[in-house]
C-alpha cells in the first residue's frame, strides 16, 4: 500500500485530496510555484517543494519538475487532481519510467478519450448516441464548410482536444462560419497544441448531465448515478447537483446504460465521468459529449449522496484493490447541490478579481461541506483559475439542501477580492431554479447580464460605510456599544459636531458621493440627506473584531483601517474609502497618533505639509495631508504643542506608521 502521495496540483483540489490521505494514514507532498509559496495547500501538506516560477508551463505543467519533487520527497505515487496534467499522457509515461504509481486510469483509456474525435468513434461503436455532426480526418476549411452546410445552422465548432469552453464557437449562419473557424482553431492551438476541429448540431435547449463511473483493475465497473450541470457561464459549470430533477426514469436508465457501455469499451479502471447533452425539444434525448478520465470538480455531490469517497477509491484502484461493491449494493440518499465560488465580478462580465485576502471566514452550517483552497493568508493571482473553492450542501430534499446552501453562501466572509457569491445566492432564490434547467439558464434569467441586486447597490451601503468609519473613531477597541444598554440615548460625543460630512468612494465600481451623517447618539446615526432616513445602529463588535451594524433591517459587518472600510453583508463584500472633513477634532489619524507625533495610519503619498518647525498647534488642527485610495486624508494634531521636527517631505510615499510631525509640549511662561 502507498504511504506517501505527491499531489501535482494546487488550491482546493490539493487540499481536498490531502484530507482523504490523512484519513487513510498516507503522508502528503505539495508542490508550489513562486506565486503559491504561502498558499493554503502548501501549509496543509506534510512536505512542500517548489517547482518553478508562477507561469503554469514553468511549474504545474512542468513534468520534469513534478518528477524531481516526487523523487526528492520520496513519494511513491502522484495524484494529478483535475486540470493541469490530469489527462496528459506525458505524466503517465514519466511515472511509469520512474517507477511511480499514477493515480488515475490506464494510459490507453486517457488516450482514447483525450480526443473528442476518437471518443465519438468509440462511443458510436459501443452503441452510445452522439450529437449529429462531423468528426472526420479531413480538416480542410473547404470540407468543414461543406459539412457545416450539411448539418445546418446553428451549429457548434469544437476543439477535438478541448475542454472548459476553449476552442468552442457557436455559428448561426454560413456567412460567419469561416471567421469563427479561424478563431476556434487559433484558440485550440494555443490552449492544447491541437487545432483539429469537430462540428456538432447546436441543441437549442440543452441540458448538461453526466454519469459518474468507478472501475478497478479486475474488470469491475459501476455507475454512481447522474449529476446535473446545466447552470453554466461561458461553457463552464457554476452549479451542480445530484440527483437531476425533472428527469424521467427511462432517460435516467438510458444514461446509465450508455455510460457503462462506453466505460466497458475502453476497460475503464478508475473514477471517470461520461458527459451527455439532453435535447429538451426531443423529449430529453441524450447524446454523448465527452468522457473526462479524471476526478471532476463536482464530485462532492456524488460523494454526499452515495457516501463513497471517490479519492479513496482512486487510490485503492491504483493500488490494485478490487471495488468492494456490486452495482446493486450502491444506493443514494437525499440531495446535494454544489456552487463554485470564483474570484470574479459577475456584474462586469465575470471579470477576474485579484489581490490579497484581507479576511476569510468559512461558514459553519450543518449539512454543508466546504472544499476551499484559501484562507486569510491567501492571495489570488492572475496566473491560475479563478475558482477559490466550493460549497456543497446535502439534505433530505432539494429544498432543504438549497436553503442550507444559501445560508452557507451568506456566511462565507471573504474580503479583499470580488466573488460571485451574491450571484450564486440570487440564482438559488429564483423560481426558475425549480423548473427544468438548461445551459441557457443564466442568459434567460439575466438577459442583460447579472447585476448587483438593489439591496446591495452602492447608494444603499455608502451610508453604512460612513457610519462604520465614524463608529470606529468613537468606539475604540474594548469599548461597548451603547446599543447594548437599553434606554441609553446620548447626543453626539464631545468634540464631534451634531452632523458630519464624509466623502465616500467604492473601490471596485468607482461610485462616489458625499454622506452627511446626523449624529443622534454614539451608537446611532442617520443619513441627513435622505428622505425618511432610517438609522444605522451599532449593535456590537468594537472589542477588536468587526463592527456589527444594522440598517433598514439588514445586518452588516465592517472593519475599518484608517480611511478604508470593508463591508460584508448577505455574501457580498465591498471596500470603501472614507474621507472626513478637514479640521475635525477626531480622525482616523488622530486615533493612531501618539501623544508626541502625528503618524500615517495607512500607506500613502504626502501631498501637503501645513506646519513647519516652531509653529504652535492646537488639538485637532490639521498638520498634513496624505493621498491614499484616490482620497485625501487629513492628519491632525493629537494635542496642543509646538512642532519640533518634520519626519517626511511632500512627495514622499510613506508606509503606515511613519511619523510625519513630531511635537513638543507647550512651554508655560513663568511669572
Regions inferred by a protein language model and the residue ranges of each:
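A generic structural motif
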Residues: 203, 292-295, 345, 542, ...
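Structured functional modules or segments
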Residues: 587-671
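Catalytic cores of soluble metabolic enzymes centered on carboxylation/carboxyl-transfer
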Residues: 300-542, 622, 655-671
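Catalytic P-loop NTP-binding/switch module of NTPases
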Residues: 555, 561-601
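Short acidic-glycine loop/turn motifs at beta-strand connectors
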Residues: 173, 215-220, 278-283, 364, ...
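Short, well-ordered beta-strand elements within core beta-sheets of diverse protein domains
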Residues: 168-170, 201, 247, 387-396, ...
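Short amphipathic alpha-helical segments
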Residues: 3, 166-167, 243, 385-391, ...
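N-terminal beta-alpha lobe that positions the nucleotide/phosphoryl donor
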Residues: 1-274, 278-299
